[in-house]
Amino acid sequence: MREFEYYLFENFDADKESRNPLNPRNILGKETDALLSEIVNKEASYIECCENHGAQFVQKLVDGGVLRRSRNRLFFDSPIFLREDAAVLHAQISSRASSLADLLESKIPEIRGCCAGITNGFPVELNLYHILCGMVFDGCFFDYLYSKGALATSRQHPSGLDYLSVIYEKCGELRSFSDGLLCSYNRFVNAECSLQSFGDANGNRHDFYRFFRLMEQGRLPEKYRDVEVLLMNSFGGANKDILLDEVVSLIQTGWCAPAAMALLEAFGYAQNGRVCVPVFTPDYQSVIAEIEGIVEKSIGAAVVSTLLDLAGSLDITAVKHGVDKLEIANELYHIVFGSINEELVSRGIVAVPQRISGEGRYFKCIELYT
């Protein structure tokens, strides 16, 4: 049996929907691995899969957008990448990403000039890591690509939840794409504030988002027990709004509740009573927009062309199964911009995140929205 990794791009509140039985995080797992393996390894019929795995479970995956039924056949309905696809992905994407990085590098002096408007006390390279690699490539540039019809950012499911799902086979050949690239956000967020980290997906980061996901799954390591007790006693359990209100208070007034400071220090967002990571306030939105505009002008058309070409022509499983091209393009874009980010790191243009054993490579920051 093959094993798979499941990735979700959620357009819903992950905390509020954590116990929803139709949340794909509560469905996808070992049982799914067995069914997907059957479909990969042979032309499994719908009836046969229902007999082997249960009609109700098969229907959950159809409703969840993982599978699609056509007459008596089951096909993949989400972007899926198998070991057999790895060589094609490496051959087609690496050189294109390097060329795009070349185009962008010519604009770096102009982009660095924009960063003069960021006065948060941190080096330009670290601010650029968060702004260019994260906020632009994994944020507003996404909106640009969507506006050009180059990718999908949303899919409404019968459950009422809006998300995109992506599946990778667990194998060394795909690891550099599935969890090795700098293209992954963790955001503990509400309408006012975000405690976030950006990096690769090669481990469980020591941050608020991962802490809450592990707690929901009942997989919280022993090292977090004191933090869990503090959270339960001081903030009414997993009430993130109360905690994030304290973060806003700290940044705007210099003070927050001692329990909030203890949590921020426990997760490395503060040290000795002070915030120790970059803070991005609404005052910096004009700078971020200016940088995004430079990126758009320098590589926007080239990225659109690259995605539309790759999503429709690559000889990979998802294309063969007729998965929506714009959903395929969404994940291909993650691979492309993650590869560009790796180029920016290796060329010394942005700060270099150090690898932490069991956690991967990432940097943290705080962003205020109001």
Residue ranges with predicted function:
Residues 90-190:
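Extended alpha-helical scaffolding regions
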Residues 78-113, 281-312:
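Short, amphipathic alpha-helical interaction segments positioned at domain boundaries
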Residues 72-78, 273-282:
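Minor-groove-contacting beta-hairpin "wing" of winged helix-turn-helix DNA-binding domains
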Residues 248, 255-268, 275-278, 293-306:
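Long, charged low-complexity terminal regions
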Residues 13-52, 189-257:
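Short amphipathic alpha-helical interface segments
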Residues 2-37, 54-98, 235-243, 370:
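N-terminal low-complexity, intrinsically disordered segments
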Residues 47-70, 251-266:
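Short amphipathic alpha-helical interaction segments
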Residues 2-30, 299, 327-368:
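Charged, amphipathic alpha-helical stretches
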